[in-house]
Amino acid sequence: MNRREFLQLGLGASAFVAGCRCPFCCAGKKPIALQLWSINKVMWKEDPAKTFADIKAIGYDGVEFAGFNGLSAKQIKKLLGDAGLRGMGAHISGDKEYTGDGLKKNLDFLTEAGIESMTSAWADYNDADGWKKFGDLMGKAADIAVDWNIPISVHNHCHEFKKVYDGVYAWDLIFRDSSPRLQQQLDTSQVVNPGLDVVERLKKYPGRSFSIHMKENVPMKHGLPNDNGYFGVPPPDGGKLVDFKGTVDYLANEPGFSWYVIECERKPESLDAARFNYGFLSNLI
């Protein structure tokens, strides 16, 4: 798909920029959100209002939810508004959440809460047909969500680039024939870990990256992530670092790109890693 075809999508990713839903996009500098799973040990166990205020004080522009802890849309909107944060998005997984009444319910909730996007955080299938059907389902959901002005994305883990069918990655089975409105939310760590290049994967589907998860490479040791949570700091086993600068340089001219999302899941008990990584990334953009 070339740039002209992308721009002709109307209410595809380009429309979110044209409508300037995200004011930072029009200004040039893209905003930074924190994926709240990064602080899952404290997010809902302490005072959420104080935690949100602390996130804002670091400099973050928004947050991406990983569950709502039973709060209503109005309560979520108030938390965001009181802290001066934007609701960048929410990770919501499960096929039923992207079809029929389940999809409508989610889109209505996100709209009321002031949350800007919806992302499937996990999927796994045992054959090529399963991945293709998932891509079709998600593409149809993305087309429907246009009426709510909410982009829908799929987030990757390592297995989408480790499962290969007749020479085709599972990730590509999701995207190559699905609606061009369906967005990819690449996780930099889980692109680099299987041995791929983040920029090359972004180039594969131009104009289909509303957001990206910026996370340092997480080599595995004994089945567990083996990193220290800090961008630019080599993991204990000396694994390859993510090329954050190269990624930022490429995304500076990517049509439809709207949000950086920092994730640092190895330090969930405090905001220390979130603070360090915000400083690291903000200096690049």
Predicted regions and their residues:
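Hydrophobic faces of well-ordered beta-strands that scaffold small-molecule active sites
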Residues: 32-35, 63-65, 87-92, 118-120, ...
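Acidic (Asp/Glu)-rich catalytic clusters
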Residues: 52-57, 71-88, 102-114, 139-148, ...
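Active-site acidic/histidine proton-transfer and metal-coordination neighborhood
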Residues: 95-183
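Acidic-and-aromatic substrate-binding clefts and catalytic sites of carbohydrate-active enzymes
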Residues: 41-45, 64-74, 93-102, 124-132, ...
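N-terminal export signals
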Residues: 5-24
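Acidic/histidine-rich catalytic cores of soluble enzymes
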Residues: 148-237
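C-terminal segment of N-terminal export signals and the immediately downstream linker at the start
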Residues: 20-46, 54
